[in-house]
Amino acid sequence: MNTEKDRLLTFQMWPLTFLSPADLAKAGFYYIGPGDRVACFACGGKLSNWEPKDDAMTEHLRHFPNCPFLGNQLQDSSRYTVSNLSMQTYAARFKTFCNWPSSIPVHPEQLASAGFYYMGHSDDVKCFCCDGGLRCWESGDDPWVEHAKWFPRCEYLIRIKGQEFISRVQASYPHLLEQLLSTSDNPEDENAEPPNDLSLIRKNRMALFQHLTCVLPILDSLLIARVISEQEHDVIKQKTQTSLQARELIDIILVKGNYAATIFKNSLQEIDPMLYKHLFVQQDIKYIPTENVSDLSMEEQLRRLQEERTCKVCMDKEVSIVFIPCGHLVVCKDCAPSLRKCPICRGTIKGTVRTFLS
């Protein structure tokens, strides 16, 4: 029974439809009966009374954590790149869940088995291998499915669950990456903001990128009002193109909040009365798409998202975290954990994807 193929052959009389023989065989089990009783070829552990939400690998880990087969499968990181070596074992990951909120409907055993460890606040978890982060867990969520849904290239996931499982999950969400790369500035699941200055700037963010040309005087006004620091001022001023300065300016205003929006509004009224009128009075400023972004490769779309490399929170380190599901890439890995909502669109952050593009 040392091979997965041999174990799979024992399931010809397997009685359950909700748990596949392939998953059980991959987790080290072969069928012995009666009923739904299976045994591990390596540790001899026996399990039965399976339920619809059970995952074979998770249950194997939970009941027989010292199984040598699991040790070989889960702890040998020599074949794939690991983001956090200290969390490469199931035991290490499981220990991080000692203060896991009891109100969260997903169990630590499931999360640790799927490669996640607890970050210590709210319900934030991160994969030890791909560094993908998830939060906002709901009843019925399967950690393996969510792992495959958002981080299909994770090498740990591929090794443990197999490409067939990942492809099946991805096929259930055919437009997921397009959604992630659409970078919507108006998340549908958020309560509408009152129509104030900040919300108008947020709503017309992309249009302002195109139409705003008087960046430096507004930047100086923000510095004089002590809304931004000299470092933040200089980072934006040093951009070589006005369009790049405009992007940075608008995004830092969205991060700083209402007072920054008020300074922007007052400065714009003096410096560019026509743009002020279209944005704040008539509210008819238009964004003109210059090209069909969907025609670009996924990698090129990410490269363009990463064009502005400075984190909009610390204005120091490079951006490296894409928020799920809004797709905005505006913060570094150190600033991301403290944020619950995207500073650009105010959408709830349900997960993070780390980018490594040069």
UniProtKB/Swiss-Prot annotation:
GO molecular-function terms, A-Z: cysteine-type endopeptidase inhibitor activity involved in apoptotic process; ubiquitin protein ligase activity; zinc ion binding
Enumerate the BIR repeat regions by residue range: 4-70, 90-157
Presence of keyword Zinc-finger: yes
Q: Which superkingdom does the taxonomy of this entry point to?
A: Eukaryota
GO BP terms in the entry: apoptotic process; negative regulation of apoptotic process; negative regulation of necroptotic process; positive regulation of protein ubiquitination; regulation of cell cycle
Q: Return the Gene3D superfamilies for the record.
A: Death Domain, Fas, Inhibitor Of Apoptosis Protein (2mihbC-IAP-1), Chain A, Zinc/RING finger domain, C3HC4 (zinc finger)
Q: Can you name a GO cellular component term? A: nucleus
Please name the InterPro entries in this protein's record. BIR_rpt, CARD, DEATH-like_dom_sf, IAP, Znf_RING, Znf_RING/FYVE/PHD
The record places its RING-type zinc fingers at 311-346
Q: Where is the CARD domain positioned along the sequence? A: 193-283
Residues the record lists as binding Zn(2+): C127, C130, H147, C154
Name the Pfam families for this protein: BIR, CARD, zf-C3HC4_3
Q: Which UniProt keywords apply?
A: Apoptosis, Metal-binding, Repeat, Zinc, Zinc-finger
Q: Is tRNA-binding found in the keyword set?
A: no
Q: Which family does it belong to?
A: Belongs to the IAP family.
Q: What is this protein called?
A: Putative inhibitor of apoptosis
Point out the gene that encodes the protein: PIAP
